[in-house]
Amino acid sequence: TVITKNGDATQVVDADFFAEYPSAATTKDIGSAELLEGEPQYFTISSGTFEKRETDYIKITISTTGMSAITKKGDNKGDINETSVYFTIDFNWVDNSGVHHNREMFDTGFQGKVSGKYAHTFGFNIEQIKADHTINDWSIKVTKLTASPQSSDSVELQNAIYVDSIEAAIADKLEYPYTAYVGGVIDAEAFS
């Protein structure tokens, strides 16, 4: 398939044409300590490796090493049931005037039963925040909520959560006046 377009002085790259191409992104492996109820942890990417104010999209991966509710007493002793854990993900930023802002992006959690690791990546776009405010610096706050079930005399819970990584991406905002552009995709299997 060949797609052509005549160049002009104000052209920008057709977003649909390059939709399958990744943006510029950097990922930081976190490997956080266990998130404790009501004790937020803050995460960011070093500004030395990435121009943070240019960030358009952020992903954060949260995991659990297992989720279960084990009955310790009674006729059902030893039964393994599902449990849950709840947490919030907030986007915090400082504007050019030094004013701190906070916006809750997710109020969510995990529910179920799993004996091994389970991870989920949450992503959110901050381009509208950038359009409404200036962003000089930012961080992500994750808080395990006190509404999460806790172990008791009759039930032993496993519902610890951790932050595995964060990723910041810059969407391509390309301008090439009077220029033709070509994109290609090569299947990785061709390089076996």
Place the predicted regions along the sequence by residue.
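Polar, S/T/G-rich
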Residues: 1-192
